[in-house]
Amino acid sequence: MPLLDSFTVDHTRMNAPAVRVAKTMQTPKGDTITVFDLRFTAPNKDILSERGIHTLEHLYAGFMRAHLNGSAVEIIDISPMGCRTGFYMSLIGTPSEQQVAEAWLAAMQDVLKVENQNKIPELNEYQCGTAAMHSLDEAKEIANAIIAAGISVNKNDELALPESMLQELKID
């Protein structure tokens, strides 16, 4: 099984909250797709609450689009990580980590402005697979924590696992 890019970086050294360019690739037509690791919490140290991350999933994608999309950037998808320490964001374009961090902070401010649970987009049984699993309060706690901490940048070259360690950790 091929080793995915996200598993070639040392999760014990990641800062959080932080932005990292996880991957860039070119489409056959020449567009650049950039995948960002938006790390909300330090891996293996903290975890986003189930209800909080689910509510953020509904809010964050729209708010990030409002702050980052433009003539040179179009967000394709923002999805929570299975480990519940952040989100992956795939987009067309190459915004800087700083631009992404600024949009992220603005999106967290937007989360704080959501008045009540009834204002969460697509929170119904027709558009959400687990409509009962939401908490606006927990999403706001996460947003407040991000704003208070600020957002740094994780660089792949600083986090790269040595090839010898990757071979040692490999499961055949």
UniProtKB/Swiss-Prot annotation:
Note accompanying the cofactor annotation: Binds 1 Fe cation per subunit.
Q: Which reaction does it catalyse?
A: S-(5-deoxy-D-ribos-5-yl)-L-homocysteine = (S)-4,5-dihydroxypentane-2,3-dione + L-homocysteine
In terms of InterPro entries, this protein maps to: LuxS_sf (IPR037005), Metalloenz_LuxS/M16 (IPR011249), S-ribosylhomocysteinase (IPR003815)
> Which residue spans traverse the membrane?
none
Q: Where does Fe cation bind?
A: 54, 58, 128
Look up the record and name the cofactor or cofactors this protein needs.
Fe cation
Asked whether the UniProt record includes DNA repair among its keywords, one would answer: no
| EC id | 4.4.1.21
Which keywords has UniProt assigned to this entry?
Autoinducer synthesis, Iron, Lyase, Metal-binding, Quorum sensing
Sorted alphabetically, which PANTHER family does this protein's record hold? Answer: S-RIBOSYLHOMOCYSTEINE LYASE
Q: What does this protein do?
A: Involved in the synthesis of autoinducer 2 (AI-2) which is secreted by bacteria and is used to communicate both the cell density and the metabolic potential of the environment. The regulation of gene expression in response to changes in cell density is called quorum sensing. Catalyzes the transformation of S-ribosylhomocysteine (RHC) to homocysteine (HC) and 4,5-dihydroxy-2,3-pentadione (DPD).
Answer whether the UniProt record assigns the keyword Metal-binding to this protein. yes
| Organism of this sequence | Vibrio atlanticus (strain LGP32) (Vibrio splendidus (strain Mel32))
Q: Which gene encodes it?
A: luxS
Q: Which domain of life is it from?
A: Bacteria
Q: What is this protein called?
A: S-ribosylhomocysteine lyase
Quaternary organization: Homodimer.
One GO MF annotation is:
S-ribosylhomocysteine lyase activity
Tell me which Gene Ontology terms the entry assigns under biological process. Answer: quorum sensing
